[in-house]
């Protein structure tokens, strides 16, 4: 059976939906907690993966650059809070990648094990997730 459903993906500059979530930095109300700032809301597929780790380390290294631009990063993935915290601790304490080490990730990482926020943001499409 053919599915002709059209999925509208979020675009740069569009207003993001509001949500409340638990993060590695405590609870947030998005976007109101970051009022007056540019916001980059991004997702990654899984904690502890090599590519995601290198990307997070790069973001961590660039933290001051984002602050100078009045820009707040917020990450979201399907992993839980305990996994996020362990991964960020591993990045800070154990990973040395291309001369980057001791990188502390200071932006919040949303706990979305239920995939509610990823679907709300159209990062995942719930009709394509097997139950």
Annotate each language-model stretch with its function.
Residues 1-131:
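Chalcogenol-based redox active-site neighborhoods
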């Amino acid at each position: 059976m053919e599915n002709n459903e059209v999925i509208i993906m979020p675009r740069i500059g569009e207003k993001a939906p509001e949500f409340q979530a638990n993060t590695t930095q405590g609870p947030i109300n998005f976007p109101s907690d970051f009022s007056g700032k540019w916001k980059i809301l991004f997702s990654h597929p899984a904690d502890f993966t090599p590519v995601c780790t290198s990307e997070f380390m790069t973001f961590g290294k660039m933290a001051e650059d984002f602050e100078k631009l009045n820009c707040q990063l917020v990450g979201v993935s399907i992993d839980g809070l305990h996994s996020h915290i362990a991964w960020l601790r591993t990045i800070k304490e154990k990973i040395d990648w291309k001369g980057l080490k001791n990188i502390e990730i200071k932006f919040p990482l949303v706990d979305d094990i239920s995939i509610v926020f990823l679907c709300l943001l159209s990062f995942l499409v719930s009709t394509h997730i097997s139950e």
